[in-house]
């Protein structure tokens, strides 16, 4: 920032911060994270976003023998996200809902299906299997749409994360012409997640943001 006297160069080297403020980098501290050699992921499907959130809260409490979190990452994908990428499980669910094949789900109401892309990592294959077993045991208390299946094969779980990476442009591509994409970060206490996510969906629908996710 102080290297330039020309106002144009000063502005060109600023970055846009929170709420549109301008900022510059005066100091950077880089901290690396341990790259666990063994990883596994699973796409967990639940019939409601509230049930998915309850499962996330429960998995957040899992720790291994060293006190580290068992679940290293959890990304929630609602029905709109799944629909935008033509997720095969979502399409299957939608078909079963349409044919009234799912008890407790109103025909045509496929908006409840929610996926949680879950990742666990470990230093050894044995630790990885212990983590998977702990997560599977935790999930027995919840109702999943399809059986839980973790994979430790990179060629398989990389596809899950590729889907996650493609969600934003895919959802954006479903917007009506002339509309604007708004992005907002919202934080909740983890214990409030089940109620908060369900109420947030209701709030978005009530105000006519039909393409939101």
Report the location of each language-model feature:
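Noncatalytic alpha-helical scaffold of FAD-dependent oxidoreductases
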Residues: 1-213
